């Protein structure tokens, strides 16, 4: 993975989560950014985890945001994360299905 793109992206996602009242999810993403600073190859298990791409309570599943604009920024950041994972050859079915759903929502204007 490209450390120069991944760490700022993870920090952006964590900041959006924190500023919108999701401290637990923000802490998880911040921890991944810290791991990536030390060893970008060690972050893969965390990136494919259900903590990000799983069901209720996962990072991608948070729904409450201060504005529609912030929620859209959050989803676009997650889509960039999926792109980074693809470029690195990381296979994550949960990420792929979540990306398809978010893309559909963003394209249709639901979000």
Specify the residue positions occupied by each region the protein language model found:
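Short, charged early-sequence alpha-helical segments and their helix-coil boundaries
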Residues: 39-75
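Short terminal alpha-helical segments
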Residues: 1-33, 97-110
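Intrinsically disordered, low-complexity segments enriched in small/polar residues
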Residues: 19, 48, 52-55, 87, ...
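Amphipathic alpha-helical binding modules
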Residues: 60-111
């Amino acid at each position: 993975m490209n450390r120069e793109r991944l760490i700022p992206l993870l920090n952006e996602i964590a900041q959006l989560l924190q500023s919108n009242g999701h401290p637990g999810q923000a802490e998880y993403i911040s921890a991944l950014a810290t791991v990536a600073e030390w060893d970008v190859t060690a972050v893969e298990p965390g990136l494919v985890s259900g903590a990000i791409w799983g069901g209720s309570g996962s990072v991608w599943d948070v729904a409450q945001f201060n504005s529609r604009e912030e929620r859209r920024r959050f989803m676009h950041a997650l889509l960039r994360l999926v792109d980074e994972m693809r470029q690195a050859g990381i296979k994550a079915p949960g990420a792929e299905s979540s990306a398809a759903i978010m893309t559909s929502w963003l394209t249709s204007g639901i979000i």
